[in-house]
Amino acid sequence: MIKKLSIVILFSCISFVLSTNFCNKELCKRQNGPQSFTYLKHIGCRHTGKNANTCPRDAKILPMSTKRKNLILKVHNRLRNKVALGKLPGFPKAARMPILRWDDELAYLAELNVKQCKMEHDQCRNTDKFKYAGQNLAYTMGTPQKNAVRIKKLIRAWFKEHENATASFIDKYRDHPQGRVIGHFTAMIQDRTDTVGCAILRHSGNKYFFWPVIMVLQI
């Protein structure tokens, strides 16, 4: 019998030696009003680095090899270049579109997210270098398939959200008025986005394989 497969991928970056004090509350300070602030919880603050207790016993992080990093960057940059050159119908050429680069500190924070073993955004993953780190999440289920194929499909699924978006959504970085999902696409092709990182977790819980996939970009 062929086991079903479930995959989630997490994108984020870090240069390993960690340089940020993740418990510095100023990293996650959000202004509510002139004199009103909220301090969000940082995913890296006091994190043990271990999988959550709710994870299946066989849950494990797949190594983010150089080959895998390059694949993620290649797919993203090709899709971003398509927009930059004005080859995506309904979207003008981009005045600037930086080539995405990898950052290991963000990848580390992405890894902490997937170690929750659930499809859920964390409240904050900012660093000293990246004050506005966004996050894309995805997962997939199905029959066994090569990791590279899964990664490509998930990234392209984010990009496919362009069918519900217009250039104005990108310029103002706003939600769709009718609630359609476009946020992954707008994060991917923002000209302010120049850094990306990833993490992949896989497990077989309840007769399923599960790979959480999350993406963190500087926005």
From Swiss-Prot:
Subcellular location(s) of the protein: Secreted
Keyword field: Allergen, Disulfide bond, Secreted, Signal
InterPro entries: CAP_dom, CAP_sf, CRISP-related, P14a_insect
Keyword Protease carried by entry: no
Tissue specificity: Expressed in salivary glands.
A cellular component term, taken from the record's GO annotations: extracellular region
Signal peptide: 1-19
Disulfide bond listed as a keyword: yes
Domain of life: Eukaryota
Disulfide bonds: C23-C45, C28-C124, C55-C117
Family per similarity comment: Belongs to the CRISP family.
Protein name (database record): Antigen 5 like allergen Cul n 1
